[in-house]
Amino acid sequence: MSFTPANRAYPYTRLRRNRRDDFSRRLVRENVLTVDDLILPVFVLDGVNQRESIPSMPGVERLSIDQLLIEAEEWVALGIPALALFPVTPVEKKSLDAAEAYNPEGIAQRATRALRERFPELGIITDVALDPFTTHGQDGILDDDGYVLNDVSIDVLVRQALSHAEAGAQVVAPSDMMDGRIGAIREALESAGHTNVRIMAYSAKYASAYYGPFRDAVGSASNLGKGNKATYQMDPANSDEALHEVAADLAEGADMVMVKPGMPYLDIVRRVKDEFRAPTFVYQVSGEYAMHMGAIQNGWLAESVILESLTAFKRAGADGILTYFAKQAAEQLRRGR
């Protein structure tokens, strides 16, 4: 007879036995979070000696490149394996055609070069998207009716990804959700000799209300206004569609896939991992961070909620986590908490 949980009966089975001591709890732990699972997203400013707090993201700052290099010393010492860069584009450099996105002297490109030179062992992941660079805050080029044009936008995204690879980024991460952009970027990278540049595809990126603080951070909230991204980001009600998106991106040459946001979409993380067994990442987005940090600062939740929330992503099947809590999590893990 096969053994199933239904065959286990009290008192011979006491599930609390293995919870009795710390050593046995550690021995039977099914999922373990380590610093190797963490990616820290950072917001990069133009200028020198610049630091700006983000009111909707307590504890997170926008940093100029010189300040970013100073902070990165500590992040590297903590063992954080990679940073995800998000540039804050000056208003005067935004345009309808998002040309600043592929400027070789743009903020992301300069930050990538500086970080690679100072910390050659540190992974640099760059955001491939147009919303920080457009005057309207959308992730692509618009037609006369305000609709985001898919194929025209891809042409700009390809130029942006190539500029990041040429600056030294080891991973480019298209977050735009245009159809076919992964294949176009992969083909361009191969043709340009960037065969080892990885693509982390934002494959299942939902049209979520949890992105608000991020848009404040990169300065696109005012540009987007009351607009939305429902014509290209996924409907939060859909689950099967996420599998189609992931399948398409893997077929087009993605090396890693992502689910975004994280906590409200743990079911999607599990489905993606079970279906494809591909490297699967999840983004604990700005709204999730703001909720947790607000509760921590007000004494409503203990700081231990940070590691608990990140462990939930591991339990759901994630191989890595983009989180603004990466530094705090690394410190807590080092202390054994």
From Swiss-Prot:
Catalytic activity: 2 5-aminolevulinate = porphobilinogen + 2 H2O + H(+)
Residue numbers annotated as active site: 205, 260
Keyword Lipoprotein among record annotations: no
Signal peptide: none
Cofactor(s) of this protein: Mg(2+)
EC category: lyase
Binding residues annotated for Mg(2+), in chain numbering: 245
Top-level division of the source organism's lineage: Bacteria
Gene3D superfamilies reported in the protein's UniProt record: Aldolase class I (3.20.20.70)
Pfam family, one: ALAD
Keywords: Heme biosynthesis, Lyase, Magnesium, Metal-binding, Porphyrin biosynthesis
GO biological process, one term: protoporphyrinogen IX biosynthetic process
A GO cellular-component term linked to this record: cytosol
UniProt record similarity statement: Belongs to the ALAD family.
Function, as annotated: Catalyzes an early step in the biosynthesis of tetrapyrroles. Binds two molecules of 5-aminolevulinate per subunit, each at a distinct site, and catalyzes their condensation to form porphobilinogen.
PANTHER family named among the record's database cross-references: DELTA-AMINOLEVULINIC ACID DEHYDRATASE
Name recorded for this polypeptide: Delta-aminolevulinic acid dehydratase
